[in-house]
Amino acid sequence: MQDLKRQKLPLRLIGSMQRVIVALAALAPLVLSPAHAEDKEVTIAYQQIVDPWVVAIANGSIEKATSYKINWRQFESGAKVATAMASGDVKVGVIGSSPLTAAVSQGLDLQLFWILDNINQAEAMVVRNASNVSKPADLKGKTIGVPFVSTTHYHTMFALQHWGIDPKDVKILNMQPNQIVAAWERGDIDAAYVWNPALAELKKSGHVLVTSGDLSKLGKPTFDGIAVDRKWGEEHKDFMAKLVKAIADADDQYRRNPSQWSATSPQAAAITKMIGGTAADVPESLSLYAYPTLAEQASPQWLGGGSSSRAAAALKDTSAFLKEQKRISELAPDYSKFVTPAYAEAAMKLK
């Protein structure tokens, strides 16, 4: 038998082996690194809500700020966003306070990390002018369209309770905003509780009976927020901080000069391209919301302060009402764990 130690390898084979070793060395960082390229991709859910951050989605500034590939998916309601997040398809999503409360009460481990807007006058119950409804009592026997498990659904049920109207005395239909507009035009519904751009369409042939701002003053505030899958967020803290900073910058641009966001502005065009509606309605729609600053977000006024934060208190109060209405069966022992100021605080340190 030949002595293998003395056997010479052909030069061609040696060259091939060297190329393989070089290739493996180049691949090693990708295999071993916890944040390789395929990890820098995320799916984010947004809704048909008129907000400054929609412009940041449209112009790509969020991708630029985070260096992530972002798959943007549009949903018509927070309940649908919650379902997508429960499936794992979506890691970050826009969700109202009511569907968020329902989701975490049912075991979904989400964290609210940004208040997209304080709803104020931006959601309202509108009644058809032809429905002969001039006061709340006139709603008896009427049909109301509303997206179930949404902030407007929550306020619809609270409004009926406040007015002393038994929900059995009205017909409440589960409809998404686009369906509400179509049903309104057909005359199938007498009233609806919804947000823009659908709300703007209904106002053209209807009048406002009550707004979310009115009901918030009675102790039932609502807001639109952005939530993240807790585990995913904790594993991508750098992305989360940069995402929050990009959203805050978009809000700041609007706050500094709202007059630049006119019906003929590039911003209005970008918003309507992303979520529909008409550019003429954008300026008024934006003015109906309040957009908390980055400092306000991190404070107890919204996300900071643990159980004493405004957001945690709102979730707790909403959960009690949802249970009373039999929309959820159990209450979480502590709603503050579903609220975090950490990413807002980190964003404040970025330039």
Regions found by a protein language model. Give the residues of each.
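Short, glycine-/small- and polar/acidic-enriched structural segments
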Residues: 38-174, 179, 190-196, 212-213, ...
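Pocket-lining segment of extracytoplasmic ligand-binding domains
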Residues: 98, 131, 179-277
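Sec/Tat signal peptide C-region and signal peptidase I cleavage site
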Residues: 31-37
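Secondary-structure end/capping motifs
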Residues: 234-327
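Conserved C-terminal helix/tail region of periplasmic/extracytoplasmic solute-binding proteins
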Residues: 311-351
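Cleavable N-terminal signal peptides
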Residues: 23-25, 35
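Structured segments of extracytoplasmic/periplasmic soluble domains
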Residues: 65, 84, 106, 142, ...
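Bacterial N-terminal signal peptides that target proteins for export
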Residues: 3-22
